[in-house]
């Protein structure tokens, strides 16, 4: 493995247990490994890739293809059922951080919690607080419980915290699309600056967004990597396949 590799995934696979009823779940707890009362759904199947330091990797695919599951594994939110993941350096995951917010705590309190989750000491977080609050731009809501926040406000706060963590790896998912245009531009400008020294994983179903921010990409389809390599080649193939599928659906609906 190259010394410049900062993320390495080898034959990753992730299965979830699907139960038809709560009764089946209870039966499984009693039966243990003797009998199976669930169906396995494989969200990821044999995913292998590497990301080098300073690279910007885009991950594209339709909703439900496995993109978010892959991010959760890279972030450490969940473990793969099979395979190995290796990550070197401090990770700032917007997706994961937003999921850990304490809904009863205020925005201010969640800045302290989020900073601690990402490995910062309390004095460091306090020193950065005013800058985080200014970046988030949610005003007096910083002193209100997170449960009162809109999805966009939660995303603002999560991104603002991640932007101040001095991380080597930034992981951004499609959550940015819920913000207003001015905040989206602020985030994109910040990401552009981060890319000069950091490593980016950017997840989207928009070829234009990937082309704007990434130099390499992987296309996930039904849990598999369908194509990987230069972002222009991957997004071109994705666009073509999407158009073919849309054309087929139009023909079918016209019959």
Question: What is each model feature region?
Answer:
Residues 212-219:
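Conserved catalytic segment of ABC-fold P-loop ATPases
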Residues 222-223, 238:
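Conserved ABC ATPase "signature" C-loop
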Residues 1-45, 231-254:
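Pre-NBD coupling/linker segments of ABC/ABC-like ATPases
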Residues 27-31, 92, 112, 124-141, ...:
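Conserved ABC ATPase "signature" region
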